[in-house]
């Protein structure tokens, strides 16, 4: 009986800790932790002027595309 009460109190305490950290993260710019990674790393594919150079503008007539990791033309 005592063990059951201790386990219930522990679970409630850990749940409360999770809820307080979730509220702390939602006060910032990002409402949810999962949105942090998608907001900063997501990029649309850009086109390049020539291969080997860094990507400049999203539109180009030569239709070469950038790598998302290195941001270099392919």
From Swiss-Prot:
Keywords: Acetylcholine receptor inhibiting toxin, Disulfide bond, Neurotoxin, Pharmaceutical, Postsynaptic neurotoxin, Secreted, Signal, Toxin
Post-translational modification: The native disulfide bond pairing has not been studied. Three isomers may exist: the bead isomer (I-II; III-IV), the globular isomer (I-III; II-IV), the ribbon isomer (I-IV; II-III). They have all been synthesized and their activity tested. All of them show similar potency on alpha-9-alpha-10 (CHRNA9-CHRNA10) nAChR, showing that disulfide bonds does not significantly affect their activity. In addition, removal of disulfide bonds does not affect the activity on alpha-9-alpha-10 (CHRNA9-CHRNA10) nAChR either.
Residue span of region Interacts with alpha-9-alpha-10 (CHRNA9-CHRNA10) nAChR: 56-64
Principal location: secreted
Propeptide segments, given as residue ranges: 23-46
Effect of residue 71 to A/N: 4-fold decrease in inhibition of alpha-9-alpha-10 (CHRNA9-CHRNA10) nAChR (ribbon isomer (I-IV; II-III))
Organs and tissues of expression: Expressed by the venom duct.
Similarity section: Belongs to the conotoxin O1 superfamily.
Protein's name in the database: Alpha-conotoxin GeXIVA
